[in-house]
Amino acid sequence: MKFAQFKRGYVLTVFVIVSATAHGEEIDRGVLIRLSNALVKVEALAADGALSLGTGVTVAPGRVVTNCHVTRNAENITIMRGGLRWRAMKQLADVEHDFCLLSVPRLDATPAEIGKAAALAPGQPVSALGFEGGIGLQIRLGKITSIYLHDGNRVLRTSTPFTSGASGGGLFNKAGQLVGLLTFRQRGTDGNYFSIPVEWFVQSIDNLPGYRAVAPLAPGLKAFWQRVQDKLPYFMQANSLAVDRRWVQLLQLASRWEQLEKTSIEPWLARGSAYAGLARPDEAAVSYQAALKLDPKASEALYGLASAYSQQGNSEKYKSAEQQLRLINPDLAQDLANEISLKQPRSIPSKS
């Protein structure tokens, strides 16, 4: 646990969790201070007295972005930072994509620098900042684990854990630029934490006619990730099936998915994962090779291909795929090496 003292007696409590995939990288203290100055706590008070707590990121003078699932029932929204409180007067809501932009006059907070989710790749380090539990601001370090195309942009999956109260918090790249909003998590192992991309809301920040007086949003509207199981985006359905180790059903889903998105690598990655789960490395390798034909620099496909070659016991092809991966994504290549060393601590046997 580390502590950093800020102006007005504001103490930022930072719990830094560095996963093995972050390779010991730390955030520069100056960057840490700059990021913390953009984060605010969000209190959303409903007519029945119910209080919803979340996090927001200052994205322009007097403008804060958070998740709509934090503010959707609110009649009154309060923004807090450093012991001070401001009232949000207006909001621009996009419930489907789960972002709400808030107009907060006289807000004393430094806007975050905006980056691009589209510039990220699996394996790259990121940091997640949010008021977990509605108490102190916490920072989690991790990496991008997967990227999924949805509605023309990239939903980011990371290994940076977050809990209630952090919704609407910021996901930042290594340079300290805002690339996404911490939004939801799926049941499963580590790395099932998802952020919506900045590209979804950045063009709406200055859309003044789109802002309305703060009031409860229309009932019945749901974000894309809150739909019933068979209406969820394919990447979420695939993740649930993989968590449950329902490999045959995942293969069936991948087939339907591929018919709808013929130029996407995601169905092939899902197919490869299913074959790997079924201990069919030859077919897994074919699936990952198909993904690489669509995107020769797809590091997730190279990762899966190398892992399939390892399952086959083909050391020569494994080394070739691992070397290609290391050129494109050194962090992910190190993850692969760690995984293989755990499974086969001595060596990968040559194929007979």
Report the location of each language-model feature.
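C-terminal cap/linker of serine protease catalytic domains
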Residues: 25-32, 110, 132, 178-243
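Canonical tetratricopeptide repeat
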Residues: 270, 304, 338-339
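Catalytic nucleophile loop of clan PA
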Residues: 57, 162-182
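N-terminal activation segment of mature serine protease catalytic domains
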Residues: 23-57, 64, 76, 214, ...
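Conserved active-site neighborhood of the chymotrypsin/trypsin-like protease fold
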Residues: 49-53, 60-129, 134-138, 152-155, ...
